[in-house]
Amino acid sequence: MRLLGIETSCDETATAVIEHNLKGKSHILSNIVWSQIEDHAPYGGVVPEIAARAHVEILDTLILEALAKAKTTLKEIDAIAVTGGPGLIGGLLVGLMSAKALAFATGKPFIAVNHLEGHALTAVLTHQVTFPYLLLLVSGGHTQMILVHGVGNYQRLGTTFDDALGEAFDKTAKLLGLPYPGGPALEKAALLGDKNRIPLPRPLKGNKQLNFSFSGLKTAVRQAATAMAPLSEQDVSDIAASFQAAVIDTLQDRVHLALQYFTSQYPSSHNQEHRPPAFVVAGGVAANQAIRLTLQNLAHQHSFEFIAPPPSLCTDNAAMIAFAGAERIARGQTSPLDIAPRSRWPLDENALPLIGTGRRGAKV
């Protein structure tokens, strides 16, 4: 089965073609990502209207490019998968309308995919991970600890009360005057800094629940930067290093508890006759090398296989959407052409909203 994938949930326009066989293995034939960094850089963050217009301008071209690079034609495509949410409504509409039009014109099966499911299943695409496994999803819009039982079967163990980790990285970088996108810039600055210079809090460290909070850490950084102003280049590096160290300590604490919980639920998963259970880190923040190394060491201490997709598949891409769509279609699932985009679409539909996250709950 050959699928065309389309991803337009935020500030990357992406298309891909994959080949998916009956055994559930996929081969990426093309994976095109068009970044809007230059469009949003003057504003220091993503502007939804600009993002949607940029998707409109380039999506058709990228669909043709993905088909050409895969050396295939639309006629040879068996199904079309597109991100249906969560994300920015304007961008989601662009991708959905294009996918629906192609499906209607060609009569191909069509499925709207949860963007988070794309991230959640990327490790199955890249490493043939077996279920169940533990997933830490860390991106610009989401920070969640998820127990992945199977395709369509997700148990949210924890989520953020406030800012997603990627958002905290970007806002801290902006506060320090670092260029957009903030996450990579802050990671680079931290390499030259003293992580012990600025005392910063470790939010929820020691808490027995598996939730996250980063707004207090962000506020502490602002207070420290204000007290030290004007900031020298070394000051910026030291604050960046101290912030990143606080994040890593917090993640270590949360992940340690999650790994213990997984082992208590699946004690036989550590049977030496089988592949060790997997701890997967996915989402854009998973590209941070300091975070990767720390979590890899922690996973190995708990006898877990550590898996982080290659950086190109950590950030938003259409290959993961095509793969998630293929897994759904293989189970007989498709979407109606009148399906609407969802700005919020939790992986775990049964998870209750966190107290203190407002009427609509946490951003899941």
From Swiss-Prot:
Fe cation binds at residues 115, 119, 316. Gene3D superfamilies: 3.30.420.40. Its cofactor is Fe(2+). Required for the formation of a threonylcarbamoyl group on adenosine at position 37 (t(6)A37) in tRNAs that read codons beginning with adenine. Is involved in the transfer of the threonylcarbamoyl moiety of threonylcarbamoyl-AMP (TC-AMP) to the N6 group of A37, together with TsaE and TsaB. TsaD likely plays a direct catalytic role in this reaction. Belongs to the KAE1 / TsaD family. HAMAP family: TsaD. This is tRNA N6-adenosine threonylcarbamoyltransferase. It comes from Bartonella bacilliformis (strain ATCC 35685 / KC583 / Herrer 020/F12,63). The gene is tsaD.
